[in-house]
Amino acid sequence: MKYLLILLFLFSNHSFAEESLNKYTINANGNVEIIEEHKYSNTHSFKNYTITGTFEDNLGNYGSHSIAVIAEYKEDNVINLQWSSKLIYQNNKVIFAQGVRKKGIDEAGVGKAILFSGEKPLNVLNNTECNYAIKFIKNNVFTKWLCNISEKNLNILKNIN
């Protein structure tokens, strides 16, 4: 019975901690520029490209971003894709993100990202893991990031200028 109570306590605390997290979203758009492409065969290729554009979060913050991407494709599917992003907020403060995508089609997919090396006050986002979805139309890209952050950090981000 004692162990059951301990387990119940741990699970209730875990649930409470999850409930105290808030959704932080970033919508980003940009243009793709292919730097280098290697066609290994008709169905296998490598691309190195950049994406530059703008973003806005669900708190009204906004800015510009630049992304460097390396990707390998086989039969129009992503085999491996890695990227690094620099986000510059309206207050000229910078935070970086890196992400990966291991599967999906060339035109769309989902992956994981982590935010890091943020300048104050963006440093409250350091080590925040996010899920992202991306889709392409010609040379245009649309992304949505979904992150969970604490109420305290959400309030800090509401007040950046």
Language model features: what each stretch is:
Residues Y3-S12:
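Sec-dependent N-terminal signal peptides
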Residues E18-N161:
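Beta-strand-enriched cores of mature, soluble protein domains
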